[in-house]
């Protein structure tokens, strides 16, 4: 999801959701590598059932890695992809299923973002090629014809990562290579014998992660689905966390590289400058060079992986989202859906974020605070099974609108303070350096002792000696300090920049090129997800010698001290230009005039933009919870409206036309620039390059990038014209008859495939049905007992012949062909359901002990009462009004102002008791945070009962007139926080008094915290307004 730093924000706010992956690595014995035996127990202490790979998160870093040379050709890229995938499988060790999902054709709403990203990627590749040509000229001038082979390597064009798009020959190679590698593993690796593998390649429409979510939803709809299956999804996108919550599968983890890991940079010996040991362990050994000038470098250290535990995130959110005195039953599953919905406002791949919300300013907390304060007025949750109630969303947005002016002013004040601190820090650093330089010059040996007398040049007294020509200088913290040169380093340490530049001048042009090309992109994100988008936490490799700041204090590309590797942008000591000036009066008029080019007085246009944005929010929510609601819808603006512009959106009637996805070539023509036309069949090239082309305006060579108040170009808004679908398809239709047969094949819609080995119980079932003398139906439904829990239909794959040879195109890279392929491949069809996916836990879920202790719960509750109010004034007062200053005017301190977050509440409003209840929920009670879905648990029988009104939850089974809660005086102390906290956090005591533990490994049967949410009772989903939901 388009929220850079979301992952980091979550991990800092909810620290226990992150843990390190324990990985067993292959051992080397007598020069031979011994692979890991993954048939053994998982070293992480829990066995995993299903592993899902969002494959683009593997393909991108393997094909154009950061910090090391890229693979030389596409064959080497495939080998890197195999190695990386094998490593991920070995650390997770799935026991039942592996699903590999490659991005196919995306919905139209995503193509706008893809188009901007690919145009910018092509622009960066062109700049890289220009740099290479410049260095090639330097090389030729310096070495003549001596290094002809190296010259040819240098001028090689930068590999175009835009080919990682459906419909290109590269994606064809990737699909065929994955099928070969999976079949090879099934034939040769005993650990894969019982594993089922589903491959959904780029010919299958849909984004990889959403194809995975569709599969999970389809399995949950099956009566025989295991509610306690352990799921792991690998990927770099932050939206995997939201999608994990949206599945409502409690045993869910996200696996990803630790993008903040910088061991090689932080753990460097300060004596010799080499990584891998501390100063006290230094042996003074010379650094081993790789290349004549050490320009090659060692292979990058394997990055560690981390788990993000969605189950623990559920626990945190259970404590944070529970609102005391809310007039309707607490339902964690629906509260989680509301939380996911609110995250969309700070950014996603389909809509720009609202101007007043930023993840680094705790924008999500701001919305949660407004949501908590308005819960009593809303009378229910914002969302229901992927559909948003726009009347309730209107309340949230109007609450935010009242804060917008204060948010913009405080943001500017924070930027100015930060800039002032940065200037002060640099001035202090400069003063310290100058003072130390003066002291060290008096005690340092002169460079004249080394200079040749005939070449020595006179210099003024006290001036630093110039480095002698041809001398390889030693850069502190960059390499070893030889003994004979150590005496020189006193005066050199304060002139690091000059030393570094001198070293660069003494390197050969090839070494300079190698160093610069491997130096990165100035903190610029690439296509491979959030690993680089979250580079705000990453510091430069060479930290300051005379002091170091925390990574948290450094912005993207902005360091506290000079770093010679990456020159600071122009005017680094000034704030970026911003003509809208959101912090000044009249900002809304300037915003719409400059960003949208409309008359500032045209209020209706503002409301039109807001309605389109509200429609987009509804589209995104459905996309996450039910699947793509429309393949053709998109948000038709580059910028978002202000919260104040959402007027009367509650009256909107939303409907989406499903439509059909683009064909692969249509998406290519819609998202690729003309410079990437090598990935598109030649018959379409003229449409992108010829001046008289009817769609030439879709492919500008130069395009504006609006920094929009940001500092770096990659943070700006790419202002490209939106694709007119009708014009594009009309122009392409004239060229389709000219395609070759191979090109036509790449433009078709493909099928998911299922692969398994002959050792799997399902193998014989498939062979007897498709390849025996008495063949069965061409398509049949899987028996889930035989398939080990896999639901769906299978169909014979015409390209597969049993026990034929497995041909490899990578034999020269150690991937051999096999004479007898003992695996099977069939087409697989995900089961379709006519019912919507319900936001609930399933009957039979078993939970382990909670990960959060009482201190964690109390801390989370306390933060929930106060967080998100940085721009609004006083703390929350329980929704009853109080000392809340919405406009940020701190000159008045009266207690008679209404609570601004509950913007539409009567200041005298006070939530009453639950309908029919003898009392309301006392403040301070937080429910157990893992095993509940709807409301507090039923206390022991025999107490008084009270019901919740049918008008609130009449359409939901378990909350209508049939639902009641029993309560006794004894249970009140257990459930409402008046008794000791032990039943929740300390030991296996039960929430149900006198019964076995309700939070341990026992089976839940639709009661307790999952009332109305589990599949219980009569296997139907009682709903007067929604129709039956089959077994729910």
From Swiss-Prot:
Biased composition (Low complexity): 910-934, 961-977
Known partners and oligomeric status: Interacts with rai1; the interaction is direct, stabilizes rat1 protein structure and may stimulate its exoribonuclease activity. The interaction also stimulates rai1 pyrophosphohydrolase activity, probably by recruiting it to mRNA substrates.
Cellular component per GO, a single term: nucleus
Enzyme superclass (EC): hydrolase
Protein name per its UniProtKB record: 5'-3' exoribonuclease 2
Broad class of the protein's primary localization: nucleus
Keyword Disulfide bond among record annotations: no
Subcellular location: Nucleus
UniProt zinc finger (CCHC-type) residues: 267-284
Keyword Coiled coil: yes
Coiled-coil region list: 120-152, 406-442
EC number: 3.1.13.-
Keywords: Coiled coil, Exonuclease, Hydrolase, Metal-binding, mRNA processing, Nuclease, Nucleus, rRNA processing, Transcription, Transcription regulation, Transcription termination, Zinc, Zinc-finger
Disordered as annotated region, ranges: 416-466, 543-579, 861-1032
Pfam families, per database record: XRN_M, XRN_N
Molecular function via GO: 5'-3' RNA exonuclease activity; RNA binding; zinc ion binding
Feature: compositional bias, Gly residues: 1005-1015
Bias kind Basic and acidic residues: ranges: 416-437, 563-574
Function summary: Possesses 5'->3' exoribonuclease activity. Required for the processing of nuclear mRNA and rRNA precursors. May promote the termination of transcription by RNA polymerase II. Essential for vegetative cell growth and chromosome segregation.
CDD domains: PIN_XRN1-2-like
Similarity section: Belongs to the 5'-3' exonuclease family. XRN2/RAT1 subfamily.
GO biological process, one term: positive regulation of chromosome segregation
